[in-house]
């Protein structure tokens, strides 16, 4: 009741409305952990009790009631709400929300009649396995998750908080793009977000989880982060949509084909993991974070490990891995799983440029980055896509002081006009630049082929690798035996043809002689080009010992503002 004794009707009010003479009954507590009651008494907003009651009412409107409505909408689509996604991502009960009471200030197009608390994004901090992370999650049930002035400010604020605090930031995107009612104000926030992404790059890990659409300017934020996770049949990313493309170019393309999760995981290389569903996407992000430090100055996470320095039966299986025929493939994952602790390897971009494998593992409980040629895909050759995939990974590992282990079996660069015309020289040079610039511990093991320029590019000693080892099956040369025969033994081949000899047999004999006399790893070892030749079974232990010796590595680049990588 009011002071005059009139019964007042409960209603929600905007902040600009006069303070209502409302209060909550003793059982009408609102807020975290409180029971939602009914309004029966008159509050006195000039008293502490009345102000607390008003806070509870506003919290109910901003969080409790808003979340109930969001669940109804999102669950009908088989999706989680923005807050549910955060709760699944962080440790139970650890999330602390920021800015849940902010509201947009737009009055155009009737926007002043719809000013929900929190706007279109939920931000805050929580923990993942006890480690603090900053999080923002766009709310598609509020203005389609569109970015406006206030929601943009919320995202920028949490990004700046993460940078100041030195903690990773994870963005969960589900947005229709810029809020057209706010015009340039919305666009300007994209620019500020991009700048914040760039300033944070190499300082704190940045992970983007795409849970819905991301169009126009919204796509460049994730592209500036370190890892992009997309959900199959749910996520889309594109600069211009199918309708615009149809109008301008006449091309008829669907949303999934244009910018779906599968497209960006297999063709464009924008995404780093194709998740089956939202749970899988969040689980991958949590697992990924377990390999990364909080920031570029922090120590790597270390886990207990029962590392065995004696050769095991599993180690000995590597002695029979390499086929006798140099042209017969094998799966490089077998080697990786023997090298890392517990055979646990988190692959990054497994569907893009599969001829090179990158990802994270642990050796003696410490994180390492793995880069390896894949002989079972395109014979392990390097091409533009593989070079760019690996170079970006090298630079990430170097930025966060994650040691790099390189496993080499590369016959060379993929030949062809398509590669040459699309810039294999310039784009292939990125991997050279990345390795040569890296100051983290670099350990390289040559398993089989290491031919030509591709050998130099793949973490060679000449580019600065600290420890270079080789298996006895390694072949290190300008080119393989078959290619060398065509150049070095052209006369002998011609004479064999004229004499009616078995040319194929002659070629094989000459190729074998070249392989033995020129490509043998012992020749490279004699000249100090590699540091040792090891039995395959000793690979795991040899890598562990090398990394242990390099823990105190100190290396500095010449003073400069920044280099000019061949972008």
Segments (PLM) and residue ranges:
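Ligand-binding clefts of soluble mixed alpha/beta catalytic domains
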Residues: 36-567
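A generic structural signal for secondary-structure junctions
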Residues: 4, 28-29, 249, 463
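Short, charged/small-residue-rich alpha-helical element at the C-terminal edge
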Residues: 1-23, 27
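Long, contiguous binding/interaction regions
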Residues: 32-34
């Amino acid at each position: 009741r009011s002071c005059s004794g009139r019964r007042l009707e409960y209603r929600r009010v905007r902040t600009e409305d006069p303070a209502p003479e409302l209060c909550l009954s003793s059982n009408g507590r609102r807020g975290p952990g409180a029971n939602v009651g009914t309004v029966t008494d008159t509050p006195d907003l000039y008293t502490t009790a009345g102000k607390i009651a008003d806070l509870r009412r506003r919290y109910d409107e901003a969080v409790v009631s808003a979340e109930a409505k969001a669940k109804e909408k999102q669950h009908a689509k088989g999706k989680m709400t923005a807050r549910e996604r955060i709760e699944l991502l962080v440790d139970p009960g650890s999330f602390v929300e920021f800015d849940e009471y902010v509201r947009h200030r737009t009055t155009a197009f009737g926007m002043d009649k719809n000013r929900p608390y929190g706007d279109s994004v939920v931000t805050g901090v929580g923990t993942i396995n006890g480690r603090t992370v900053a999080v923002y999650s766009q709310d598609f049930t509020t203005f389609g998750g569109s970015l406006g002035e206030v929601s943009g400010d919320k995202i920028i604020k949490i990004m700046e908080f993460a940078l100041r605090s030195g903690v990773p930031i994870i963005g969960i995107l589900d947005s229709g793009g810029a809020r057209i009612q706010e015009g340039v104000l919305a666009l300007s926030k994209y620019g500020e977000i991009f700048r914040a992404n760039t300033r944070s790059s190499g300082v704190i890990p940045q992970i983007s989880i795409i849970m819905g659409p991301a169009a126009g300017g919204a796509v460049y934020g994730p592209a500036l982060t370190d890892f992009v996770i997309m959900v199959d049949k749910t996520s889309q990313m594109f600069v211009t949509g199918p309708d615009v493309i149809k109008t301008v170019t006449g091309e008829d393309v669907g949303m999934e084909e244009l910018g779906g999760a599968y497209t960006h995981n297999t063709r464009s290389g924008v995404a780093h993991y194709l998740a089956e569903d939202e749970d899988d996407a969040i689980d991958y992000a949590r697992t990924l974070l377990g390999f990364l430090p909080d920031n570029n100055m922090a120590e790597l996470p270390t886990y207990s490990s029962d590392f065995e320095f004696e050769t095991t039966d599993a180690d000995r299986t590597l002695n029979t891995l390499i086929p006798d025929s140099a042209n017969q493939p094998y799966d490089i994952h077998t080697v990786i799983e023997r090298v890392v602790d517990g055979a646990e390897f988190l692959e990054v971009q497994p569907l893009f440029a599969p001829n090179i494998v990158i990802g994270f593992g642990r050796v003696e409980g410490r994180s390492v980055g793995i880069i390896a040629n894949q002989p079972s895909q395109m014979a392990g050759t390097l091409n533009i896509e593989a070079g760019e995939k690996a170079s970006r990974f090298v630079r990430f590992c170097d930025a966060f002081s994650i040691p790099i282990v390189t496993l080499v079996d590369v016959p060379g660069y993929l030949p062809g006009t398509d590669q040459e015309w699309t810039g294999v020289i310039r784009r292939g040079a990125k991997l050279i630049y990345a390795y040569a610039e890296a100051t983290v511990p670099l350990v390289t093991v040559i398993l089989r082929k290491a031919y030509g320029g591709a050998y130099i590019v793949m973490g060679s000693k000449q580019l600065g690798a600290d420890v270079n080892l080789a298996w006895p099956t390694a072949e290190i040369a300008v080119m393989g035996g078959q290619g060398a025969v065509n150049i070095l033994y052209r006369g002998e081949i011609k004479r064999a043809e004229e004499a009616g000899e078995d040319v194929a047999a002659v070629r094989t004999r000459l190729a074998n002689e070249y392989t033995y006399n020129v490509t043998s790893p012992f020749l490279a070892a004699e000249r100090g080009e590699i540091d040792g030749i090891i039995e395959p079974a000793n690979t795991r232990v040899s890598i562990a010992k090398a990394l242990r010796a390099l823990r105190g590595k100190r290396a500095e680049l010449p003073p400069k503002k920044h280099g000019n990588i061949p972008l």
